[in-house]
């Protein structure tokens, strides 16, 4: 039994379904079923109080919990975002194994006492190049038999700027120091990834193209030509993508 925690609000879910052909949670569910066809998977959204209540009442039946990516920004700290953090905190009270991806990593880090802020060195738009596993990462089960340096789908403007107490940094790249993280909080073990092994590059290209105006407005690229060259770079990387080494 696996519980998937959706990281988007309904409006952003619609956007992801249109651009990436699935919500974050459904996309992840599809991948898990591809890897383990007999998996039993439930999806909840922390914004819906009835769903979180039921999930917490039945928390012991899950073998693992996955917090997905999402388009919200932690420091906006809306009531909905507070519910995501609260749900993570409540999960930590129980013996859980948790995988937290992108937005999920940021939510779980804050819930465990860490801090999140806009990335000092910019953003990942569709791709993270040359993520490097450090010595601690080489010893962690999440990076067992993986390449030491790899490139992966990624999309984030914010980063974990202060890791939770006792957390272990596992990997970094030139944009974000925290790309892979392991920590315990309460009774739970949490593995966090700032990138997206759950997505493919064509989805990142579609999401980037659909957000082009916002990306250019935020000055992530100097002009539209630079943005287009970046998408072309992702298309080239798509040809090299090795599924086994996305994480």
What are these regions (language model features)?
Residues 1-17, 27-29, 133-247:
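Amide-donor transfer/coupling interface in amidating biosynthetic enzymes
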Residues 17-20, 79-83, 112-116, 167-168, ...:
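Short, glycine/charged-enriched secondary-structure capping and boundary segments
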Residues 41-46, 75-78, 128-132, 147-149, ...:
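Short, flexible loop segments at the rims of nucleotide/cofactor-binding pockets, characterized by
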Residues 44-47, 119, 155, 172:
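Conserved beta-strand termini and adjacent loop/short-helix elements that scaffold enzyme active sites
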Residues 62, 70-137:
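Cysteine-nucleophile active-site neighborhood
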């Amino acid at each position: 039994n696996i519980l998937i925690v959706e990281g988007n609000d309904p409006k952003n879910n619609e956007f992801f379904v249109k651009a990436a052909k699935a919500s974050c949670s459904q996309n992840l569910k599809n991948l898990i079923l591809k890897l383990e066809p007999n998996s039993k998977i439930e999806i909840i959204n922390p914004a819906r109080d009835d769903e979180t209540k039921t999930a917490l009442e039945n928390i012991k039946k899950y073998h693992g919990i996955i917090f997905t990516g999402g388009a919200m920004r932690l420091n906006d700290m809306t009531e909905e975002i507070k519910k995501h953090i609260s749900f993570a905190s409540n999960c930590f009270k129980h013996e859980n194994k948790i995988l937290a991806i992108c937005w999920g990593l940021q939510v779980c880090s804050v819930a465990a006492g860490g801090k999140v802020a806009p990335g000092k060195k910019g953003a990942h738009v569709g791709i993270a190049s040359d993520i490097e596993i450090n010595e601690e990462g080489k010893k962690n089960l999440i990076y067992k038999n993986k390449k030491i340096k790899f490139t992966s789908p990624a999309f984030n403007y914010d980063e974990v700027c202060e890791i939770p107490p006792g957390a272990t940094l596992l990997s970094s790249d030139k944009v974000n120091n925290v790309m892979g993280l392991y920590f315990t909080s309460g009774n739970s073990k949490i593995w966090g990834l700032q990138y997206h092994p759950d997505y493919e590059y064509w989805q990142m290209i579609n999401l980037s193209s659909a957000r082009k105006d916002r990306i250019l407005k935020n000055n992530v690229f100097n002009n539209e030509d630079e943005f287009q060259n970046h998408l072309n770079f992702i298309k080239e990387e798509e040809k090299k993508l090795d599924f086994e080494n996305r994480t």
